UniProtKB/Swiss-Prot annotation:
It comes from Plasmodium vivax (strain Salvador I). It is found in: Mitochondrion matrix; Nucleus; Cytoplasm. Its EC number is 2.1.1.228. Keywords: Cytoplasm, Methyltransferase, Mitochondrion, Nucleus, S-adenosyl-L-methionine, Transferase, tRNA processing. The lineage of its organism: Eukaryota, Sar, Alveolata, Apicomplexa, Aconoidasida. This is tRNA (guanine(37)-N(1))-methyltransferase.
Length: 693
């Protein structure tokens, strides 16, 4: 047997994990197998090994039967006598008479079995099947026979291997109860008694068989525990990101990490890439150095979470599948028609979730690649109420403060959208309280909408969009609409359908003149990107973003989908009005545990604007004019100091502490480092915060 230190390749692993198992097996006619397999009392005693058949053909495993002399006959006679002592019936000779005769002959003259023309080589044996029994049966049988002064054959396995457990309940208790009942009572467990009665009643034979198992009969966890039996924390759990398996190896596995990765890759067909994190997340973009251990070097992946498709490049941006429970918790916490501010959004997963609850979402990330994939995922999931930004966190929050989304008095949000956010949102959707009515019409396109898309398809700059949006049954209409005699009709319909989705009305060539576009619109105004009243905060691709003032050059993207020229937004901007009267509380998500608490100081300005000690000209308290602003701020801390750590930082950054705050443990990063989230209503931060100047 090889030691773990000798394991260098997958071939070494396969050699090490080979093992044999000697056990009893039932021999019966193949026509009775299905009936026996349906017997739940008998089924719990059958051998259950990963990717190993429960029923074996006699001829294929004939060579695995063990020479035991008179032992098999003694076991069978013991079973018959035991059942008779319980009041069992006679053996049925109709069902398996041939099997009984042939195997009786075999037990008395086993030494001649290998000779040609013996009963084992006769044709009727093709009707025989073997059902191996597990170690639990061997142990229970051994306890029964010991009371008669007998024991089972030496070498028969008594210890169940991993994977040899069934959770099928027997009469009077589960599987573990069955194993204990034999020791507690003089008689056999009820489930075993029922199997023994079946053996006698059906004329089933008992034989001893030695089976060989190996790498193919073990799952990933079993293989790793077999290779590293002395390790209490063998890596058998890992984070899955689409087709990527992400492991964090400690030093003691340094020499074996590649072979462990090969095992994981080989045992899991959905995995194509296995990586190791070489350092911690210390840079602004929350990325780490990837070490490829096995598989293909492909970090562009797709995953699903709660019916949401998420596309990302794991090498260039942050993602943590372990936070799914936390995302679900936030989803259940946030009410419908809330305003969501995700300061460190990554690929936008919080907003993608919460937009399903008709929330107006503002998502920001300083990482340009994360920002680009955020927009990709919005389009992929057909979300229509998410505005995306690529800004420093403080600049992002300051932008929202100037927009006035935290004020109860702001009924209409007037803002300018760049081309990307113009594509992301639907004004009809975000300004409608009855969203279900809007969503109900998404199933099929109306004929007029198809013709509008057809006209756009004829133009060179919109071919890609039409390939995605036009259905197969509309393609013939597209060809017809491109003809000269249909152009006028398309233009008229284009004007009429302009309100159905704003992206259709701005994809045509801006240099073309259209007499039907002269009608002014109150909600939409086009401005040059360099206009003094240009969009607040929306950063065009290529402009550097910072958290601390330093310039962060964008990283190369390896020709990803986000770099496609046809998807790049133009410099055109749009004036829009959003009805904030239909939205309620504000939820600010700050999922950057390393430094998120340090960013709370950006809300000092908001506390000063709505100081509890000030009144407006009508005599109303300024603080009452502020929406409920619920902060969800994540942080790392030692488990014994988490509350003091949060309270100290909140007091330092905000100049006061809230009346109430809730701290929830999210996950264990290491024994001395846990992730928490502190949650409070910014509106309830008083005392020193009232005196901020």
């Amino acid at each position: 047997m090889r030691n773990a230190v000798d394991i260098k390749t997958l071939a070494d692993v396969k050699e090490k994990v080979k093992h044999e198992k000697r056990t009893h097996c039932l021999v019966l006619n193949k026509y009775r197998v299905n009936e026996l397999l349906k017997n739940k009392d008998a089924k719990i005693w059958f051998l259950n090994i990963f990717r190993f058949p429960s029923v074996l053909k006699f001829r294929e495993y004939q060579g695995c039967l063990v020479e035991t002399g008179p032992y098999d006959g003694e076991v069978l006679r013991f079973i018959h006598s035991y059942v008779e002592s319980l009041g069992g019936g006679e053996v049925s000779g109709q069902v398996s008479g041939q099997v009984n005769d042939q195997l009786s002959c075999q037990m008395t003259s086993h030494a001649n079995d290998s000779q040609a023309g013996t009963p084992l080589a006769d044709a009727p044996l093709a009707d025989c099947r073997l059902i191996p029994l597990n170690a639990r049966f061997n142990r229970a049988l051994h306890e029964l026979m010991q009371r008669e002064g007998k024991g089972v054959l030496e070498g028969v396995d008594m210890r169940p291997e991993e994977g040899d457990e069934r959770d099928v309940a027997a009469e009077g208790g589960g599987v573990e109860d069955v194993a204990q009942q034999g020791a507690a009572h003089q008689d056999a467990p009820p489930a075993l008694e029922k199997l023994l009665r079946v053996i006698k009643a059906e004329g089933i034979q008992i034989r001893t068989i030695q089976l060989q198992f190996g790498y193919d009969n073990m799952n990933t966890s079993q293989v790793l525990r077999k290779v590293f039996p002395s390790e209490s924390e063998v890596i058998h759990k890992y984070e899955m990101i689409g087709h990527i398996a992400h492991l964090n190896f400690c030093e003691r596995f340094e020499n074996h990490k590649k072979v462990i990765a090969e095992i994981i890759l080989d045992k899991n067909k959905s995995i194509r890439t296995v990586i190791n994190k070489k350092d911690s997340l210390k840079n602004v973009h929350r990325t780490f150095t990837i070490e490829l251990l096995a598989g293909e070097e492909n970090y562009l992946t797709m995953l699903r979470e709660n019916d949401i498709k998420v596309k990302l490049n794991y090498e260039l941006m942050y993602w943590n599948s372990k936070l799914k429970k936390e995302r679900d918790r936030i989803y259940s916490l946030v009410e419908n028609n809330s305003i969501v501010v995700d300061v460190f959004a990554g690929v936008g997963i919080f907003s993608l979730h919460l937009s399903k609850k008709n929330c107006l979402c503002f998502s920001n990330d300083i990482n340009l690649h994360a920002y680009n994939f955020m927009n990709v995922n919005i389009k992929l999931n057909k979300r229509r109420s998410i505005l995306t930004y690529n800004l420093d966190a403080r600049a992002f929050v300051c932008m929202l403060l100037r927009l006035g989304i935290f004020s109860r008095d702001t009924s209409t949000l007037a803002m300018q959208l760049g081309e990307q956010n113009w594509r992301n949102v639907s004004l009809d959707f975000v300004n409608s309280a009855g969203r279900d009515v809007v969503d109900a019409g998404k199933g099929k396109k109306r004929a007029a909408d198809c013709k509008v898309d057809c006209k756009e398809d004829c133009k060179e700059d919109c071919k890609e969009d039409c390939k995605e949006d036009c259905k197969e049954d509309c393609k013939e209409d597209c060809k017809e609409d491109c003809k000269e005699d249909c152009k006028e009709d398309c233009e008229v319909k284009d004007c009429k359908a302009g309100d159905s989705h704003q992206s259709n009305s701005h994809q045509s060539n801006p240099h073309e003149s259209n007499p039907h576009e002269s009608a002014p619109r109150d909600k939409k105004k086009k401005l040059a990107h360099g206009d003094a009243n240009g969009p607040l905060g929306e950063r065009p691709p290529g402009v550097a973003a910072t958290h601390g003032g330093e310039e962060v050059p964008p990283e190369p993207t390896n020709n990803e989908a986000e770099q496609k020229a046809e998807d790049a937004p133009t410099n055109e901007t749009h004036q829009v009005d959003i009805n904030l009267g239909i939205y309620g509380d504000v939820h600010v998500l700050m999922n950057l545990p390393q430094t998120a608490l340090d960013f709370l100081d950006v809300f000092r300005e908001l506390l000063h604007m709505y100081s509890a000690g000030q009144k407006d000209p009508q005599g109303r308290c300024r603080r009452d004019q502020m929406r409920n602003v619920f902060i969800h701020c994540y942080f790392f801390s030692k488990p014994e100091l988490f509350y003091e750590h949060a309270e100290r930082n909140i007091r330092m950054q905000l100049g006061g502490i809230p009346r109430e705050m809730k701290i929830t443990e999210i996950r264990k990063v290491s024994p001395s480092k846990l992730m928490y989230v502190v949650e409070f209503n910014l509106k309830d931060v008083f005392s020193q915060g009232d005196q901020l100047g």
